[in-house]
Amino acid sequence: MGLLLLLLILTPLLAAYCHPDFRLLEKAQQLLQSTGSPYSTNCWLCTSSSSKTPGRAYPASSREWTTIEAELHISYQWDPNLKGLIRLANSLLSKVKQDFPDIRKEPPIFGPIFTNVNLIGIAPICVTAKRKDGTNVGTLPSTVCNVTLTVDPNQQTYQKYAHNQFHHQPRFPKPPNITFPQGTLLDKSTRFCQGRPSSCSTRNFWFQPADYNQCLQIPNLSSTAEWVLLDQTRNSLFWENKTKGANQSQTPCVQVLAGMTIATSYLSTSAVSEFSGTSVTSLFSFHISTCLKTQGAFYICGQSIHQCLPTNWTGTCTIGYVSPDIFIAPGNLSLPIPIYGNFHFPRVKRAIHLIPLLVGLGIVGSAGTGIAGIAKASFTYSQLSKEIANNIEAMAKTLTTVQEQIDSLAAVVLQNRRGLDMLTAAQGGICLALDEKCCFWVNQSGKVQDNIRQLLNRASTLQEQATQGWLNWEGTWKWFSWVLPFTGPLVSLLLLLLFGPCLLNLITQFVSSRLQATKLQMKLNKRVHPRNSQESPF
């Protein structure tokens, strides 16, 4: 009876219980309903959290190539034979940095973010860079590229760079040339690519339109009223709507195509003429790498996804968006994991003993390429964030150990160098004795330690976010699973203590009343039977 009362009391509470992940599931279902999807009811939204399952990449449309913004990062190296021109070279380098738009202050972190991603669909534009000594970032097959633009790696052309402190104007490398298969691009009037300033002020001729500028059209755009045009002077793409006139401004400060072509240059050298002749003196060389500034966009190179491309990169890449491998399964399909049913009913269709691994949905935009959003289960995201933080922290500790070993080795080498110089002091030192150039090691451990410190800060930030956001629910589930076996006995004892005296009193009164009724009946029987015996004729 106590168990029956317990079930009657707890059934409404269990029916009204709502797991916190129901909100994510409801949002996903509402998103399906708002898009008119036939799977808005009676279906499962699933995605795999396994690292072996490849993700999906969706190429950006031709028009999105004109709006996605990039940023540049410059690192430089002085020429060893600079000598007395160091002051002028430093002034020139400062001017070059000022004239470059949208310079990234923090050094980018290179390397693939994901390495097992499949491109879905055909990319309208791909960029290929081929250098024997380049850094390979991955190569897309030509079958998934509609138009492939190839960056010429052998270009060695220069242009004068205005600087009033030099007697002869310095020379500056021009942007690399872009080649493409004959007949893939269409010639258009020059007016469509002239007068297109960028959204930021720049004095660098790499980003300024020329007086005469050939304009080429990227074919196979969905709308006949819209064009995507290639500016070969600045290696930039423009979106053109023929119904709105020719003077349509460029949106990004540095376009993604311009950043990709500039980053293919290796040791771009600035040189100045010493005399009126043809001899030149090199001042400094600089590396330019590029990153995507627009959030959510990535470089898709083969099966690798990158946020930044290093200097002298090689491979075939496009740009696009990334999502996990998400699928929609019909409701009658047997799934390998338990998951929740319809959220509008108070009862649960399947047993709640595991939360969903991951729930999400990516909606492709009007061009069929953009991703509107991805929803994830809270608990899985929390665990993933913790794992990433732990991996970053472990990597930082490993880098610290390696750097300490390098510092120790450098100290030993320098000590040996001093000893050899002392032994060969009569000959002018070890370098003069060997008749070779002297090489000195420059310790970069400070920069490495700064990067390690940044990695540790990122790890601590991820751990704090995971703890603050999701630890309460995780702790609640652990506490609930521990207390649940004792809930039944505790509730039964509580009910017994609350209602036991009342029930005992009722039982006592009932027994007492029955006893009194029995005694009264017995007295009546004693009185009635003697009288009946006296009146009997027998």
UniProtKB/Swiss-Prot annotation:
InterPro entries: TLV/ENV_coat_polyprotein. The keyword Methyltransferase does not apply. It is found in: Virion. A motif (CXXC) lies at residues 43-46. Residues 500-538 are cytoplasmic. Disulfide bonds join 43-46, 43-439, 431-438. It comes from the Eukaryota. PANTHER family: SYNCYTIN-2, VIRAL ENVELOPE PROTEIN. This is Syncytin-2. It comes from Callithrix jacchus. The gene is ERVFRD-1.
